[in-house]
Amino acid sequence: METPGLVVHGEAAPFSTALRSLVNNPLYSDVRFVVGQERQEVFAHRCLLACRCNFFQRLLSSEPGPGVPSPVVLSTVPAEAFLAVLEFLYTNSAKLQRHSVLEVLTAAVEYGLEELRELCLEFVVKALDVELVCEALQVAVTFGLGQLQERCVAFIEAHSQETLRTRGFLELSAPALLPLLRSDKLCVDEAELVLAARSWARVGAAVLERPVAEVAAPVVRELRLALLAPAELSALEEQNRREPLIPVEQIVEAWKCHALRRGDAARGTPCRRRRGTLPREHHRFLDLPFK
């Protein structure tokens, strides 16, 4: 009886190095990509991409016609991120950079590269800081990356004031902002949070060319106006007349809490203090303290 064969393994490093030398190398390349807004030309090898990634297998399944084939245009992925994806497909490793890792993560999700996605997520979690966290939160919400969203929200809860001052906060979508405004653990006072929400809505209104109140509508119900002192609420009401942001009925509800000297236990959240809520004299009348 013939003895079963034995699988032996050579050194992996030289193999990986050799394949890395083919990344974006026109030598023996049979497919060209034009990627990103910069329209950078990138060379690759059809069989390798197809066997490593179902997305590229489908994309490249048609046989190229005679003559010089037209390039495959991928305009939404930046060139640097696409090259990192290619490096991973060729070598099963990639060099990630803080400034571009979210773009690589986005590409990994869109191309169905689960292993690269997990590597990017691990990198992002370790690299989280005030400047990166809102961009990471936006990616997490957009692609339903629940664990990353939880880590981002927890980071922002611990560094609320610094995060609210970043450009990334102003560029959040409404669905990404909602979990922050719903949090009891934000280390920021409600008056400052109202100002941040107004700044966010102004930026969105300018970009989308829509009224501030319309942009703010999906999120402002999460502002806890009953936590503001009467003088603060009066000032907010006056500003709201000049620049509508908050529905009038929401301000009326806050005044009702002051008039009745109690919170609305049925609705709960509008009267519940956050971790960073500064004490005010009327808070002793509210039913729901910070938990």
From Swiss-Prot:
It holds the Pfam family BTB. Residues 134-234 form the BACK domain. It comes from the Eukaryota. Residues 29-98 form the BTB domain. SMART domains: BACK, BTB. This is BTB/POZ domain-containing protein 19.
